[in-house]
Amino acid sequence: MKIKLVSYSKDGERIVAIAAKMSRSRKGWDYHEKEMTDDEIETWIRDSITHGYWSVLEHSVYTFSIEGISRVASHQLVRHRIASYTQMSHRFAKPVDKYYKPITPPSIEKRGKEVVDKAYQDAYNYFYQLLEKGVPEEDARYVLPNGVNTNIVVTMNARELYNFFGLRLCSRAQWEIRAIAWKMLDEVKRVHPRLFKYAGPNCIIHENFIRENPITLDDIDNTVFISQRCIEGVTREGIPKCVKNARSILVSEDGVVMGK
């Protein structure tokens, strides 16, 4: 898989901070835009996130190109409804040889790869047999597998990304959507480290609601959690290990699953 942040709100961190401050001030945009310091930006972002003041994060927007994932993963992705999606259509983009690279889960790589390889090849052959019989592409594609590779353009604002990360960075998320989420997090932290400093699975988000000083993913090894257990039932003693296990997923551009 290949995940790339292709566009984003360049001044997103500053915009979020100014919006947060304006909600508590009688002064307008020009004043706060001129007077806002870098330290204030970090403070307003942190306080907005730890107090659940999520609406200000909606002002910063991000567009990703996500390539070489399965239809299984893309179907999970589009369940996050506060977003915009444009996906490759197998009605118009037929799976010709060099572009037909269905995704094989790591559990199958070790147990039944030959079975899946045959199923994928059979589906490919059946697709073209149907086309030869005059079946239109929009109907012939019904025989293509859930694992067929696809590309999708995704646009989310920072608030929805926090919600997406909370659910999909978690070890309970399926491996492929989890790998997508961790790569997307890496991309947004590269351009907006302050805005996504406190992003993480829901165990991190919910913990920060009750802590005086919020924690980050980098603090996980040195943190004693206040929460007795996360919403998935993992005890506070087990949360650090659970997060590290979730973070260990890494998938190369050619689909090889590796440790991180």
Curated annotation (Swiss-Prot):
Subunit annotation: Homotetramer.
Residue ranges occupied by any ThyX domain in the UniProt entry: 1-202
GO molecular function annotation: flavin adenine dinucleotide binding; NADPH binding; thymidylate synthase (FAD) activity; thymidylate synthase activity
E.C. no: 2.1.1.148
Broad enzyme group: transferase
Active site: R168
GO terms of biological process kind: dTMP biosynthetic process; dTTP biosynthetic process; methylation
Motif position, ThyX motif: 79-89
Binding positions for dUMP per the UniProt entry: Q76, L77, V78, R79, Q87, M88, S89, H90, R91, R141, R168
Short name of one Pfam family: Thy1
Homology family: Belongs to the thymidylate synthase ThyX family.
Cofactor: FAD
Biological role: Catalyzes the reductive methylation of 2'-deoxyuridine-5'-monophosphate (dUMP) to 2'-deoxythymidine-5'-monophosphate (dTMP) while utilizing 5,10-methylenetetrahydrofolate (mTHF) as the methyl donor, and NADPH and FADH(2) as the reductant.
Reaction(s) the record says it catalyses: dUMP + (6R)-5,10-methylene-5,6,7,8-tetrahydrofolate + NADPH + H(+) = dTMP + (6S)-5,6,7,8-tetrahydrofolate + NADP(+)
Annotated binding of FAD, by residue: S55, R79, H80, R81, Q87, N157, A158, R159, N163
Pathway where it operates: Pyrimidine metabolism; dTTP biosynthesis
InterPro entries reported for this sequence: Thymidylate_synthase_ThyX, Thymidylate_synthase_ThyX_sf
Protein's name in the database: Flavin-dependent thymidylate synthase
Cofactor binding mode and count: Binds 4 FAD per tetramer. Each FAD binding site is formed by three monomers.
PROSITE patterns reported for this sequence: THYX (PS51331)
